[in-house]
């Protein structure tokens, strides 16, 4: 074979799309599609048609550029098998490692609190509206559900992980199926409410504020940051030695782009289908009731008068069940990350990093009591879920997903080539706007 043929063959091999790339594309996509998606239509549809159209324009750039920035940070370490904690320690020392451990824990733990509130409200709504049973004590329901999940986690962790992986695709398929099945129920209410002569850009209910708050729920819903570090390590081990760091970065960006497109297509279609079936006022009611959109859809179809279609009857019961399964799936997935993070913090600060001073069983018990106890307190208090996402969950995710990579690009020599780019400004702006929601909620 000539030198030219070898070069052509090498280039063809480099440009090929492998089965592992498809697996990771679907893995990133599946990680992001969870219970958080069930609240996106409520916030997106709350302000009517124009804000959700603006969110549609922003959705892909937010998903792609923010996750690409985090992936570039993970790629910047000298060790191809090093995770994000090792990479941050390499750039910023041990203090940086402690900071990233705290960020990871506090980025995931509030999500468990959110899911604790959500699963309690969803179950109680299903119990009272679909099953027509008398109301139960909120504290008892929250405690029962959390103890049930704790039992499953304690005695069947391996089974739980396997079941979670099987639930991802049926949940995504059910979202797409529901979105398509809602089309016959679409109406023009959301379009009729558009009054171009009376549009307010500013103010509490203005378009800009609605989109600003919508950015937070997009950061929350379009989030697969927990798996980015593992994804980058896998791709570096697969590609870097043979093709180099630059090619690996392009391959990671390509996979993140395709995963983001899939994610945005499914979530935005679901959001639009819900909005055209319901109305902005219905979305406001769902927010006030503190329930996910599927539970509200179930109640909506239950209240229809006259003869119901088969779909309406199935959705009346099926929507809440799908929501419960989605929340269970998301809770289990985030619990594992929270447990790992809290174990690390307890070990580091309680036992000075000495693993011989405490058994793993005792460590897991201490962490589980704190996690489940704090989740029960929040679930019983029943704060508004969207407010909790916007004021707590999304800002912490944004600090990890957006601001940490941008700070690293400014400071780390290995990331210097990415400085001065327009997409850095965009990612920084998204991170700051999301964090500033905390200030907005206070005032």
UniProtKB/Swiss-Prot annotation:
Membrane topology: Multi-pass membrane protein
PANTHER family the UniProt entry points to: SERINE TRANSPORTER, THREONINE_SERINE TRANSPORTER TDCC
Keywords recorded for this protein, A-Z: Amino-acid transport, Cell inner membrane, Cell membrane, Membrane, Symport, Transmembrane, Transmembrane helix, Transport
Known catalytic reactions: L-threonine(in) + H(+)(in) = L-threonine(out) + H(+)(out); L-serine(in) + H(+)(in) = L-serine(out) + H(+)(out)
Transmembrane segments: 22-42, 44-64, 97-117, 140-160, 163-183, 207-227, 259-279, 319-339, 366-386, 389-409, 423-443
Intrachain disulfide bonds: none
Subcellular location: Cell inner membrane
GO molecular function terms noted in the UniProt entry: L-serine transmembrane transporter activity; symporter activity; threonine efflux transmembrane transporter activity; transmembrane transporter activity
Function of the protein: Involved in the import of threonine and serine into the cell, with the concomitant import of a proton (symport system).
Gene3D superfamilies found in the cross-reference section: Amino acid/polyamine transporter I
GO BP: amino acid transport
Gene: tdcC
Highest rank taxon of the organism: Bacteria
One GO cellular component, as annotated: plasma membrane
Recorded family membership: Belongs to the amino acid/polyamine transporter 2 family. SdaC/TdcC subfamily.
Principal place of residence: membrane
Organism: Salmonella typhimurium (strain LT2 / SGSC1412 / ATCC 700720)
Name recorded for this polypeptide: Threonine/serine transporter TdcC
NCBIfam families in the cross-refs: PRK13629.1, stp
